[in-house]
Amino acid sequence: MDDAALLARLVAELDHPNATRLGQALLALISSGELPPGQKLPPIRTVADQLGMSPAAVGQSWTLLRTRGIIETKTRGGTTVIGPPRSQRPQRFSQLNEVVEHTRVDLGRPLPDPRLLPDLGRALAEVGRRSHGLNLSDPPPITPQLREALAGHWPFETDDVVAVHRGIDGVEHALTALVAKGDAVAVEDPTVPRVLDILDRIGARVIPIGWLDDGPDLRELMRAFHSGAKLFVLQPNGHSPTGRSVSDAWLDEAAELVRRSEAHVIEFDNFPLLHPARKTLGVAVPEATVLIEGYSHSHGPDIQVAVMGGPREVIARVEQQIAYSHRWVSRVLQDALAVLLASDEASATVRAAANEYQRRHAQARGW
């Protein structure tokens, strides 16, 4: 397909072109093979003129496709198609699943006890009665009901929030938004295997930061920042696999390191409502903190919704990524989570579950 044919195709398919729709159209053509690897794309200004878009908007489409490894741009060689997105096997996660298949009791993953979960059926019934705006083709990134339910729950002032599919999906989106191939990333050690799989796929250089009694080693973190790391990934609450949480003193010192280094922090917390004290760097450095909260452990694994909050520019990039992939998170599940977060009965159930988990952990430590 030459430039003229490609531009004619885009003009015919895009009635109201914008950065998201243009990127989706190009991704479809690349995935189908109509734009094969090695083909040159027209200059950004040419595409902008033909579609009636600004060069900046076309550039946003190019940037996101380039971030996903679908196209590449060289200073003198223009922009070339690399090929459709490649699905890399998550090696560490696959190994964990293979071990679980031959294990009687799985202690490697913190799965919720179904007997301690709030009633999802009642929440879904309430959503069916009162939710508006379902079955829209272009819904907002987060439903008004869930945004309202989070207003009194989010642990610090943040620019914006967006719904994602579970916690690890949010982590992947945040890493993709902030990390490029070859970047150095400081990561707590140990950490969730999927995080390392995602960084492998991106092509990042991981700098492990070992956990001590009160949090990741701050001397190692300082050395990582000095060596060029501009991002730190950690679980401040209920760290998996150790179950530890950072101390208040650790938060104070770590926040000062983040300020001096001008780095970003990605925090993922799969147990935000199951710990009596929620620890986050976002209270001290909200401008640098991206927090992903998952609710499958407190409200059930069928609540396939997590929420990400952070700086406006990061959330905007994530919203673009979502628009290029699964488009949106189910509004039915978002509103069901909103109902549960606002319910006194569900909240009491979650508090009772938190107490029971703490009792079990204390008992296990005594073995």
Task: Please annotate each region the language model reported.
Residues G133-E262, P272-A288:
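Conserved core of the PLP fold type I
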Residues L291-W367:
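PLP-dependent aminotransferase class I/II
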Residues P112, P236-H239, H297:
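Short glycine-rich anion-binding loops that position phosphate/pyrophosphate groups of nucleotides
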Residues M1-G128, A323-S330, Q334, A338-L341, ...:
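N-terminal basic, amphipathic alpha-helical segments
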Residues P84, A177, R244-S245, Y295, ...:
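Residue-level signal for well-ordered alpha-helical positions
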Residues D217, R244, R259, H264, ...:
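Hydrophobic multi-pass inner-membrane translocation pores used for secretion
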Residues T75, N237, D269-F271, Y295:
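Short strand-turn motif at the edge of the Rossmann-like AdoMet-binding core
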